């Protein structure tokens, strides 16, 4: 009996021990499974985006990490260098891992060629690049950004990346970063050699996104300069001919002040984007971030920022009902035109100005569009000349009061200031500069005039050089909108006239919209619009209508000639009846393979 009891007791213990062991195994399996699921998530299935040179947003959208192509949705982990930090990063829900690469024992007697994960001044690490990549590739789908702190680490690291890619193991975007130019406030040169860095990438691992940056210094309590036009242009020149996608890392606290340069930079190629980063103690302004957000496409800017700035910014940025502030020198996209949208979407509007005794009252348009202001000059009895708008009844309205009246409305507008007499140019620009400084110009602004230059010199019009010089000196943050004198257009826009206008605008950093009359354009060489648009990535053409001596057929030939070249970069300053007919005609013939300059079949309003 005692034996049975002993055996029974022993059996019970083994059963209990077995149950506990099974429970423990199941628990461990579940934890490992959940961890592995958290790390891997759905795999990347589309070969077009599952590659080192893929667009980061396309990749993250493909694997279900983001819902649409918006750099604000991407999350980052900084300095995932040591094995402890790497594990923490891998177990987090961030989308892109950022880590620093140098060589072991950098600049000491113990230096080797082994790439390790460390940020200066550290020159040793418990993690080599090879170990880091093995861990990241085996247990996550996270994007990779490698920041190279020394040129010596670049070659061996790219060799390793190439080997892993050729083995089919790197199926995600890889960004290769280095600071290759001396930037703001830096007293000594510490940057990686630009020529050698870019050459190594082309030679050893060209299938990646390049992230070339500036060395920077920012001290909150001291005066700080920002990125200059020369810096930005030098950087763009270095990467212009490269085939890769390029994302420029820019210090967020300095970016708003240099926005005119970055607006220009982003317009130079669809391959370009910015990655805004924040130093640990940088006082980044949410207002500045919102301005940058408002004046760029969502896919053009990544935001690598600290809390609480990131959450505060994201909450406001994703609020679709907030009032936005646009850069005066920026594009009509997205203010009035959708990205890649038809320029015909943009409507030119006129203010309704009513005479009331000696004063004029404004009735603002009830819809969004480009507001055309024809500006002259009034010589007061005392004081400086004042730029004004004149009414049919003889009253005058100052340009400043008009713009202030428009600024209080929430409607999206852009402003086209058309200078009608030479003496009004600089006073008008001074008014624009003053209001912009006060924050009363929250939209894109065009400044245009009929210019006199070369073979189209006509007395009474603004000298072409004076228009560009005045803009550069008084208020450069505008789109320049030059037109040819009507007196010279009897035979259309002849090649010499187009060539001379392009010569006049050579070196212009502002966007330019060449103003073309529809009638004369219909009599011009077929390549006229194409030549003007080829002037720069920011060049556009505005076709306008003048009733003076133009046949109906010539007008519509001009409109269709412009549409045949490019529908996103051509605008139409034409009367409402023409615009309605053109819209209706476009709708009736969409889609159409007949897009040549001569395709004017069935002019609106014309019997066939």
Swiss-Prot record:
Homology family: Belongs to the menorin family.
Region of interest called Disordered, as start-end residue ranges on this chain: 588-608
TM spans (from-to): 14-34
Annotated protein name in UniProt: Protein FAM151A
Topology within the bilayer: Single-pass membrane protein
Pfam families according to UniProt: Menorin
Domain of life where this protein originates: Eukaryota
């Amino acid at each position: 009996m005692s034996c049975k009891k002993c055996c029974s007791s022993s059996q019970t213990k083994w059963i209990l021990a077995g149950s506990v062991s099974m429970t423990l195994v199941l628990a461990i399996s579940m934890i490992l499974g959940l961890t592995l699921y958290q790390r891997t998530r759905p795999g990347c299935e589309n070969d077009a985006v599952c590659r080192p040179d893929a667009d980061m947003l396309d990749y993250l959208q493909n694997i279900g990490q983001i819902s649409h192509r918006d750099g604000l949705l991407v999350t980052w982990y900084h300095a995932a260098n040591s094995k402890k930090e790497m594990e923490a990063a891998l177990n987090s829900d961030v989308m892109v891992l950022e880590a620093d690469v140098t060589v072991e024992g950098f600049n000491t007697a113990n230096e080797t060629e082994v790439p390790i994960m460390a940020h200066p001044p550290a020159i040793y690490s418990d993690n080599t690049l090879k170990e880091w990549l093995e861990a990241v590739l085996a247990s996550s789908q996270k994007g990779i950004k490698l920041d190279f702190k020394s040129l010596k680490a670049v070659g061996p690291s790219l060799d390793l990346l190439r080997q892993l890619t050729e083995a089919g193991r790197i199926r995600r975007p890889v960004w290769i970063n280095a600071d290759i130019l001396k930037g703001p406030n830096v007293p000594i040169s510490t940057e990686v050699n630009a020529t050698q860095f870019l050459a190594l990438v082309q030679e050893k691992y060209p299938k990646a996104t390049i992230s070339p940056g500036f060395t920077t210094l920012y001290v909150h309590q001291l005066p700080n300069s920002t990125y200059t036009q020369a810096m930005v242009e030098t950087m763009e020149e270095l990467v212009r001919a490269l085939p890769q996608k390029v994302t420029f890392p820019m210090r967020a606290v300095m970016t708003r002040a240099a926005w005119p340069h970055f607006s220009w930079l982003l317009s130079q190629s669809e391959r370009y984007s910015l990655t805004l980063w924040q130093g640990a103690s940088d006082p980044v302004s949410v207002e500045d971030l919102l301005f940058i957000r408002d004046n760029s496409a969502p896919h053009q800017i990544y935001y690598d920022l600290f809390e609480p700035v990131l959450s505060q910014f994201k909450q406001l940025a994703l609020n679709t009902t907030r009032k936005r502030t646009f850069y005066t020198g920026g594009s009509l996209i997205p203010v009035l035109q959708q990205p890649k949208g038809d320029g015909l979407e943009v409507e030119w509007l006129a203010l309704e100005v009513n005479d009331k005794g000696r004063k004029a009252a404004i009735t603002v348009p009830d819809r969004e569009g480009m507001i055309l202001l024809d500006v002259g000059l009034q010589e007061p009895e005392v004081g400086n000349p004042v730029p004004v708008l004149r009414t049919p009844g003889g009253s005058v309205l100052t340009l400043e009061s008009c713009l202030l009246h428009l600024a209080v409305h929430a409607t999206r507008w852009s402003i086209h200031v058309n200078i009608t007499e030479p003496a009004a140019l600089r006073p008008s620009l001074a008014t624009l500069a003053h209001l912009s400084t006060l924050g009363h110009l929250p939209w894109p602004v065009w400044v245009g005039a009929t210019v006199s230059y070369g073979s189209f010199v006509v007395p009474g019009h603004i000298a072409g050089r004076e228009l560009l010089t005045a803009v550069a000196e008084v208020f450069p943050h505008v789109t320049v909108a030059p037109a040819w004198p009507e007196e010279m257009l009897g035979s259309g826009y002849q090649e010499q006239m187009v060539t001379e206008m392009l010569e006049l605008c050579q070196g212009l950093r502002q966007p330019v919209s060449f103003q073309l009359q529809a009638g004369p354009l219909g009599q011009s060489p077929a390549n006229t619009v194409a030549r003007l648009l080829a002037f720069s990535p920011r060049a556009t053409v505005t076709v306008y209508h003048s009733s003076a001596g133009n046949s109906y057929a010539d007008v519509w030939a001009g409109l269709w000639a412009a549409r045949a070249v490019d529908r996103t970069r051509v605008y139409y300053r034409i009367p409402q009846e023409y615009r309605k007919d053109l819209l209706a005609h476009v709708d009736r013939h969409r889609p159409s393979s007949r897009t040549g300059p001569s395709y004017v079949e069935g002019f609106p309003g014309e019997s066939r």
